[in-house]
Amino acid sequence: MVKFMKIKSIAAKNLLSFDDFKITFEDGDVVTIFGPNNVGKTNLFRVLKLLRNIINEKISAVDLEIYLHNKNLKAAKIEVDVIFDKSDKEVIAKFLKIFFKINAPDLIRLCNNLKLNIINSIIDYFSAGSYIWECSELRCYRPYFMLRLRSLEEDIEKIKIYLKERELSEITPDLIDHSKVIHELDRNVEIIEVTNDLKNIITSSVNALITIYEKNEKLFFSTLIDGKENITTRIGDGNIENIVEISMKDFTKDIEKYEDCFKRLTMDKNILRAFVVLLALDKLLANKMSIYVKKVLEYSKENPWDKEIIEDLKYIVRFCGFDYRDIYEISDISLNDILLKIYENSLIFYEDYLPNEGKVMIPDYMIVELLAGLKNNSLEKNVKSKILELFKTSTTKDDLYLGILSMPSEKWIPSYLFYLKNNANLKLRKRYMKIKEMFEYIFNSGSLSFDVILANNKPDIVVYSEDIEIPLNMVGLGVKKILEILTLVFGYESKVILLDTPFNQLYPKYQKRFSKILKDTENIDSQVFIILHSPYFINNENIFNTFRFYKPKKSTKYICIGSIIKDLEKTFGTVILDRTTRKILLSDAVILLSSALRDIPLFDLAEYEDIPIDEYNIEVIRPQNTLSFGKYYALLQYTSIPYILMLRSWILYNLYEEIKDGEGKVRYKLLEKGKYHKIVEERLNFFKNRHPFWISKEEFDKVINIYIKTLEAHREKLIELGYIYLSSKEEVVKYCIEPLRKQLEDILRKKLFIFTVPTDFIIEPQDLKNIQIEKDKYIVHNYIGYRKDVLKEFKEFFDYFVKFHNLQ
């Protein structure tokens, strides 16, 4: 059973950084999103907030243009898939009870005769669906809900099994037993005609429903009011090609005519339930899925014994944000209004602090009375009774914060914690205790805790350690942030809480403890979305709801980290999610150093030549061997994290191998045709069926072919010159490496982002004494010299790399 409303997917078309974007979430309660700056992470939250603002009419169609991804395309769409929880269904059930009492008493009577609770039957179908908003130059629709009729789909599957067992392709009238009709009613022509008509209506309607399901593989029901409210166009995906006529008019316009016969028919329970649900949906459509307040009030006067309908109406009115005292000014409330309000009330954005700021759900005079009593210790017993009375009469369903007069927004934490701590509802008091427990866990080394007190007749918070008390406004920002986040995460239930980089001010130790709290989702009664830049929150517990956002060109894309980690662990047979992996995942780009260069202090050298490596989140990784290289390369490739390969030119362009003659003298022999340096051969073999994500396989193969052909052509030239053997490294550099580097360097740098350093790039301390005259050509760092010209080349190369990959 779903504990709370959950967002299952979010889709956005032509909005912000999203071209045609959809992200789907797994069953976990915590969703983690990370990635470089300015790639669209926060835009995901902005899309959810935009939908909320459109629902509550805080934004007009004219203002929407600034949100468009492509300003020339005057169209946009948002679709948010959700699963409802028990409390959401309770609200919908109250609405449906009122609706059917007012608009379909004949259907209720019919269902009662069948011993079928129409509300219970139909509310089961309100389990999941999509909030949809779409806008174009022609028209901007009000957001509506596309209900996924999963239970009805299950009923149809059972009907299909029922038919298969009888070797039938469709429901026939013979499957509906009318013997009871003949036995209990007159056998006149009229009764027989009504019975036959009724059986035909049932079979044709449910058969049409089965056909629609088989065409679509899913069943939907839209709450969009567009003047085309009929059951035929509303069941299914709305595609005209998939429409199958469902004819129920004869039955619905005169239920009384068929009632006596209908209740005496015997049929498969799934066929009966499917037909009744169709009747109910048809009634909803016929009345524009709305309850008209005037009709409800008239019904209440005529049926004073029905106290429930007025209580349900009050609940619905307040749920929709109206004051019941203004009931006569309210014309109607639609099912769409209810469903949209569920969405609006469910979202809590961290930057907003609270979703219903300014709405005082408990009268101010009661607050003043309560606070005055709390100040006077002699009224302790009266105070307790006042608190109980206050919170017993408050609306705890929405868990709105305690609006203390005109309390500024920064005071919401004391107000809300005061509300939880003193609530008559034990469940709410336990939330306060949980917040306090988690706060003390995070600060256990400092023995910190907090309490809610009254200061100047207003709730306030003091933080204390042993005998020292500090007001909340005097503690560090990190402590405040932790209390805010704990209050949001543990102080609410049935919410979708969206936290945008909430941990930036927190010391790493506290981030780590927070991550441990979020690993255990058993005590979290809301779905939590977190945008962050911390490695501590990337863990195996939530890995399948962990996503990396990136923007390869102008549109945001994402990668599910869990799927990648699972594939890599299967491929390499080892644990992938380690400390280095987490650092890579959070980086903007990675530099892979060959083993020969692993000791280069790259970040320190970059400062000498103003190479802007530290302006970006760059990780330098030093693979220990080919397997290690393969693991990190695959991770980078799957996650589309840009990378640089940095190695010595001696490796990439060398066609010679070192040998020793009989006297032990070192010489260099030209390798046979098709033979290269060992590392080059390993990499060529590795890339046989792979290619960097930023270029196509064809383009990559073309570059590799140019590389190999150039090496082979130069090998032939060396043979012609008689350079089969060379006597020194300097000769290998002069006749082999440098000529090849000049030919291939540009294409390898610009296409594959391979940067090579010459053999004399590094000057060891003992050799520095011999180059004092040329010291201005070297940077000396920790007694080792590095060629300045190579670093200047790397700066140009790095600038090109940044621009190519659009690093922000």
Swiss-Prot record:
- Asked if ATP-binding is a keyword of the record, the answer is yes
Q: Does the keyword Lipid metabolism apply?
A: no
Q: Which GO terms describe its molecular function?
A: ATP binding; ATP hydrolysis activity
Q: Which UniProt keywords apply?
A: ATP-binding, Nucleotide-binding
What highest taxon heads this organism's lineage?
Archaea
Q: Which portions of this protein are annotated as coiled-coil regions?
A: none
Q: Which SUPFAM superfamilies match?
A: P-loop containing nucleoside triphosphate hydrolases
Give binding positions for ATP.
Answer: 35-42
Segments passing through the bilayer: none
> In its UniProt entry, what is this protein called?
Uncharacterized protein MJ1542
Q: Which organism is it from?
A: Methanocaldococcus jannaschii (strain ATCC 43067 / DSM 2661 / JAL-1 / JCM 10045 / NBRC 100440)
Tell me the classification of the organism that encodes this protein: Archaea, Methanobacteriati, Methanobacteriota, Methanomada group, Methanococci
